[in-house]
Swiss-Prot record:
Function: Protein phosphatase that catalyzes the dephosphorylation of the C-terminal domain of RNA polymerase II. Plays a role in RNA processing and termination.
Enzyme class, first EC level, given as a word: hydrolase
Principal location class: nucleus
Presence of the UniProt keyword Nucleus in the record: yes
Entry protein name: RNA polymerase II subunit A C-terminal domain phosphatase SSU72 like protein 4
Catalytic reactions on record: O-phospho-L-seryl-[protein] + H2O = L-seryl-[protein] + phosphate; O-phospho-L-threonyl-[protein] + H2O = L-threonyl-[protein] + phosphate
GO cellular component, one term: mRNA cleavage and polyadenylation specificity factor complex
Annotated family: Belongs to the SSU72 phosphatase family.
Compartment(s): Nucleus
UniProt-listed InterPro entries: Ptyr_pPase_sf, RNA_pol_II_suA
Domain of life of the organism encoding this protein: Eukaryota
């Protein structure tokens, strides 16, 4: 498969940490990538664990950054949120919801099982138009800076292997089994159709 033809999406809950870290790394490697969230709002860590800071998906990363800077620069610098939002702003203006995207992808990576379920349910509820297959692969990635980076590199490695594959459809299952052994992670995988 030619590198320019593999169309990749990465989806997490809020399109802030895990999907954007993967977006950043895949983009640097020259892949065609988009990233998304699935929830109705973006939730970021707040002053207490049960009090997140909530934004609408229409809020830009720059607006979130400036709002958190005003609220508590020290807290949001210390926990890495300002760094994450700064990185995100360099990639795209703001978070996007997967359910509102009409683009077609070859592979969609999700970062937790509930997101995988939402993506598969959304794809199955759409009217099929082209019957083009899309592989949906879940890899559980904890929502921490370190785990987001490790998960992004694993997603990148899978994408690079798929780019070198003569037949993605035939080789994907074997590749995922090899990656499960190598990384010590298990994957969920299904095929949906556009």
């Amino acid at each position: 498969m030619l590198s320019s033809t593999l169309r990749v999406a990465v989806v997490c809950v809020s399109n802030v940490n895990r999907s954007m870290e993967a977006h950043s790394i895949l983009r640097r490697k020259g892949l065609s990538v988009r990233s998304f969230g699935t929830e109705s709002h973006v939730r970021l860590p707040g002053p207490r664990p049960n009090r997140p800071v909530v934004y609408d998906f229409a809020t830009t990363y720059k607006e979130m950054y400036n709002d958190l800077l005003r609220k508590d620069r020290e807290r949001y610098t210390r926990n890495g949120i300002l760094h994450i939002l700064g990185r995100n702003e360099r990639i795209k203006p703001g978070p996007e919801r997967f359910q509102e995207c009409t683009d077609f992808f070859d592979v969609i990576f999700t970062c937790e099982e509930s997101v995988y379920d939402t993506v598969v349910e959304d794809l199955c509820s759409r009217e099929q138009q082209t019957f083009q297959p899309v592989h949906v692969i879940n890899m559980d990635i904890q929502d921490t800076l370190e785990d987001a980076t490790l998960g992004a590199f694993l997603i990148c490695e899978i994408c690079q292997c798929l780019q070198q594959s003569d037949d993605m459809e035939d080789n994907l299952e074997e590749l995922l089994l090899q990656m499960e052994e190598k990384a010590g992670k298990s994957f969920l995988h299904t095929v949906c159709f556009y």
